[in-house]
From Swiss-Prot:
GO terms for molecular function: cysteine-dependent adenosine diphosphate thiazole synthase activity; iron ion binding. The modification 2,3-didehydroalanine (Cys) is found at C233. GO terms for biological process: thiamine biosynthetic process; thiazole biosynthetic process. Substrate binds at A102, E123, Q124, G131, V196, D235, H250, M304, R314, M315, G316. HAMAP family: THI4. Homooctamer. Its main location: plastid. Its EC number is 2.4.2.60. It comes from Chlamydomonas reinhardtii (Chlamydomonas smithii). This is Thiamine thiazole synthase, chloroplastic. Its cofactor is Fe cation. During the catalytic reaction, a sulfide is transferred from Cys-233 to a reaction intermediate, generating a dehydroalanine residue. The gene is THI1. SUPFAM superfamilies: FAD/NAD(P)-binding domain. InterPro entries: FAD/NAD-bd_sf (IPR036188), Sti35 (IPR027495), Thi4_fam (IPR002922).
Length: 357
């Protein structure tokens, strides 16, 4: 009996499938002639305007023609420039991991105070900006507590002044403006859709016996990084850096990756990442800015990643601390570079003196 029922249901399913297939073909045949040609549309418009005693509509884009191009030219135009960037930024002064609000603010400030530095800005997503495209709970407006609004003035981003804070009409206005300023700097290269999979850590004699420093990042295209485990031999690439600024955000699938990796390497004081505390806007923003620092030699932490390592409160949907923490991180990065150069010079002088003795 069960077999007969299965056969019957199979026949019904086959009939329904045949009907749906036939219906799809019928719809496709009917749909094709329903789009009139542009010439027919233009003639109809001209006739209607003439009856109304109006001149024909013209636009600057009538009979628009593009310059000729070959597909191979497009290929070479993209490929040549991308690999030129990969070659030039294989050794960078600063690598910023994460192009959210803190990472972008850091890149912006580096361009202002040290435009000669070569800065590689890494972002695992196709679209940089992190969570700064919207305010809280997917709302449009962005709240920035004073005096962080001074950066908005510098960028000429309009806002509504509410006394102790300002409101940007749409968060995307600030983020897109900040991004455009960053990318105009010829010494900044954004590598989006590029994941940082690991850190380069090396011994540094200038730091004394057993001293280690972060010396760069291990990178891969994001889609390749997500496919690990499905294929073998998908080795990464590398970028050496004088200093790495980690702006990876709070914990999550792609969050706090820099400080979590340091913990696994035994380089975080206390040996673990406690995670951020409960939300307290009043306390959180000041804590984030004032604790922005070089956590280990060669690596500066900025933004909400600091809350993960310090156990400080989460901040919620206010963005002033992200902006100012990123800007402070830029100054910390420049100071770290200068300190490293001074230590290296002192170590070289000491080695030369010993050799002469």
């Amino acid at each position: 009996m069960a077999i007969k029922m299965n056969l019957a249901s199979s026949k019904v399913g086959a009939k329904a499938s045949a009907k749906s297939v036939r219906g799809a073909r019928l719809v496709a045949r009917v749909a094709q002639p329903m789009s009139p040609s542009s010439a027919a549309t233009a003639a109809a418009d001209a006739s209607m305007l003439a009856r109304a005693g109006l001149p024909p509509t013209t636009t600057p884009y009538d009979d628009y023609k593009f310059a000729p191009i070959r597909e191979a030219e497009v290929n070479r135009a993209m490929t040549r420039r991308y690999f030129k960037d990969m070659d030039e930024f294989a050794e960078s002064d600063v690598v910023i991991v994460g192009a959210g609000s803190a990472g972008l603010a850091c890149a912006f400030e580096l361009g202002r105070i040290a435009p000669h530095l070569k800065v590689a800005l890494m972002e695992q997503s196709v679209a940089p900006g992190g969570g700064a495209w919207l305010g809280g709970q997917l709302f449009s407006a962005m709240v920035v507590r004073k005096p962080a609004h001074e950066m908005l003035d510098a960028l000429q981003v309009p806002y509504e002044d509410e006394g102790h804070y300002v409101v940007v009409r749409h968060a995307a206005l600030l983020t897109s403006t900040l991004m455009s300023h960053v990318l105009k700097n010829p010494n900044v290269k954004l590598f989006n859709a590029t994941a940082v999979e690991d850190l380069i850590v090396k011994p540094d004699p200038a730091l004394g016996p057993g001293g280690r420093r972060v010396a760069g990042v291990v990178t891969n295209w994001s889609l390749v990084a997500q496919a690990h485990g499905t294929q073998s031999c998908m080795d990464p690439n590398v970028i050496e850096a004088g200093v790495v600024v980690s702006a990876c955000g709070h914990d999550g699938p792609f969050g706090a990756t820099g400080v979590k990796r340091l913990a696994r390497l035994g380089m975080v004081p206390g040996g673990e990442v406690p995670g951020m505390g409960a939300l307290d806007m009043e306390a959180a923003e000041g804590s984030i800015v004032n604790n922005t620092r070089e956590v280990v030699p060669g690596m500066v932490l900025t933004g909400m990643e600091l809350a993960e390592v310090d156990g400080s409160p989460r901040m919620g949907p206010t963005f002033g601390a992200m902006i100012v923490s990123g800007m402070r991180a830029a100054h910390m990065a420049v100071a770290a570079l200068e300190r490293r150069r001074a230590l290296s010079a002192a170590a070289a002088e000491g080695a030369a003196a010993e050799a002469q003795a």
